Amino acid sequence: MSNQQALVIFSGGQDSTTCLIQAIQTYGRENVQAITFQYGQRHAVELERARWIAQDLGVKQTVLDLSLMRQITHNALMDDTAAIETAENGVPNTFVDGRNALFLLYAAIYAKGQGIRHIIAGVCETDFSGYPDCRDVFVKSMNVTLNLAMDYDFQIHTPLMYLTKAQTWALADEMGVLDYIREQTHTCYNGIVGGCRECPSCILRERGLAEYLESKKAV
């Protein structure tokens, strides 16, 4: 695939960094770009991580400002004063309406301008967080919509879609970057460097790592 280019939607978290490294190994560093979105997220430390990782990996990064989302929607991920809650049923209060739809739209606009057809997103529905825009059916629908809207043959790839978090850690290990992902990425919703170990994102990350390391020990 060395003659093809890819654009990775990149937050600086575990999943998107895993996807970025996989893309570099698949397409070649010179054929990969990253796009990052500032949308008023309370865990803005991830933006700093994203910048550092992109630079460290030698990948061109573009950061787009979508903070206008604060004007039209409210959720715990964009409100520092709101408590982060996990819904027993329904959508968690950290869900940002339309976020992944906007990310894919702006990524596609940018990609077309760069002559890029492959867009990679680290969304996953296996360890389902309750986010409707992380489902495969949504991504496939958005792929069709973008192709029709821009008359362009985009291919949206979601390599983690059916992986558990433990399997995502296993993938990082297979690529030789498990320690890099552990030490350099940021996932915490509360914006705490190293993780708060209490928010849903931290719990999922740590549980998945523990499961993978335990299974590795048993082999």
Swiss-Prot record:
Annotated residues for binding of Zn(2+): 188, 196, 199, 202
InterPro entries named among the record's database cross-references: QueC (IPR018317), Rossmann-like_a/b/a_fold (IPR014729)
Enzyme class: ligase
UniProt-listed HAMAP family: QueC
PANTHER family, per database record: 7-CYANO-7-DEAZAGUANINE SYNTHASE
Family label: Belongs to the QueC family.
Protein name: 7-cyano-7-deazaguanine synthase
Species of origin: Neisseria meningitidis serogroup B (strain ATCC BAA-335 / MC58)
